[in-house]
Amino acid sequence: MSQPLTVDCPTCGAPVEWTAANLNRPFCSDRCKLIDLGAWAAEEHKIPVAPDAEDELFSEDLPPRH
């Protein structure tokens, strides 16, 4: 039988078995999952976008929505 895939917890670096039984994957625990969620909520993590793409999102050149 082969070894289950193991990944590192993104929060603490602990090894985590990637199995259906591990409901916290890729995290090792609920605690690490909540720490990561808090970091996203505090905007410590961001998805990169091109600088001008953000300007287009908030452009005043768009017609008003009614």
UniProtKB/Swiss-Prot annotation:
Molecular-function annotations in GO: DNA topoisomerase type II (double strand cut, ATP-hydrolyzing) inhibitor activity; zinc ion binding
The keyword Thylakoid is annotated on this UniProt entry: no
One Pfam family cited in the UniProt record for this chain: YacG
Chain sites annotated for binding Zn(2+): C9, C12, C28, C32
Subunit architecture: Interacts with GyrB.
Task of the protein: Inhibits all the catalytic activities of DNA gyrase by preventing its interaction with DNA. Acts by binding directly to the C-terminal domain of GyrB, which probably disrupts DNA binding by the gyrase.
Protein name (record): DNA gyrase inhibitor YacG
Organism: Pseudomonas fluorescens (strain SBW25)
Lineage: Bacteria, Pseudomonadati, Pseudomonadota, Gammaproteobacteria, Pseudomonadales
Gene: yacG
